Amino acid sequence: MSQSFTPRPLVIAPSILAADFARLGEEVRAVDTAGADWMHLDVMDGHFVPNISYGPDVIKAMRPHTTKIFDAHLMIAPCDPYLEAFAKAGCDHITVHAEAGPHLHRTLQAIRNLGKKAGVSLNPGTPISAIEYVIDLVDLVLVMSVNPGFGGQAFIPSALGKISDLRAMTAGRPIDIEVDGGVSAAVAGQLAAAGANAFVAGSAVFKGGTVESYKANIDGIRAAAANARGEMV
C-alpha cells in the first residue's frame, strides 16, 4: 500500500432509498442481518435536489429495527432548522451539503452540539477547498459520485481524483471518507485505492430481494474494497 496513514475501517452503508418502502422495517432488519455497518438515510426536499424522500418521522419509525449507525445525508436547504429533529429521530451522523447554505461552520457546530458526528457532502462540481477551513469540525466527508437526487445513476470517474486529494487533506485526522453514487463491487476497489473507506450502495445492495442476496452483494463490495487495501475479509 502506498498510503502512509492508518486506514479508517471499511464501512458498507446500504442506501435505504433503494429499499422497498412498503416493507421498510423488514428491509432495514434484512440489511442489518446481511452485514451492513451503517444505514445511509437520504433525505431530499424537492428544493435543493429534484426529488422528495422522507423526513424525521420515517427515520424515527425505522430506528427500533436496528442498532446500526444511522448515517443521515441531508439534501435539504435550509438544513439548520431541522437538525434537532433529525438528531431526536435517532440519527448518529448528520451530513449536510457544503452548497446548501452560507454558514457551514455554524451548521457543523450545531450538529456537534447535538452530540452527533458532523459530515459535509460535496457535489461532483464542488472542490474540496470548500471544507478546508472547517476541517476541524468534520468527522466525515461524503463525496457525491453522481448528481444527488435519484438512485441508480452511473458513477462519475472524476470522483476518484477528488477522493485521493481528500485523503491527502485529511491525513492524520480521524475523518471517514464516504462515497455515494454508482457504487458497486466493480468500482469499490478503485474507490478504496483512492482513499475512500465508507461505501454507500443502493441498488447494488438491494437487488435480489432476500437477506441472502443482500449479504452476497454487501460481501462483494467489501471484498473488492478490502482487496484494494491489501486486507483480508
List each model region and its residues.
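N-terminal amphipathic alpha-helix/helix-capping segment at the start of soluble metabolic enzymes
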Residues: M1-A18, G25-E26, A226-V233
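Hydrophobic faces of well-ordered beta-strands that scaffold small-molecule active sites
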Residues: L10-I16, M39-L41, M62, F70-L74, ...
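Conserved, mostly hydrophobic/aromatic
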Residues: L24, V31, D42, F86, ...
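Catalytic cores of alpha/beta
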Residues: V28, D80-K88, T126-L137, G182-F199
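N-terminal active-site wall of soluble small-molecule enzyme domains
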Residues: L41-A110
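Histidine/lysine/aspartate-rich catalytic loop segments that bind and position anionic ligands
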Residues: S121-P157
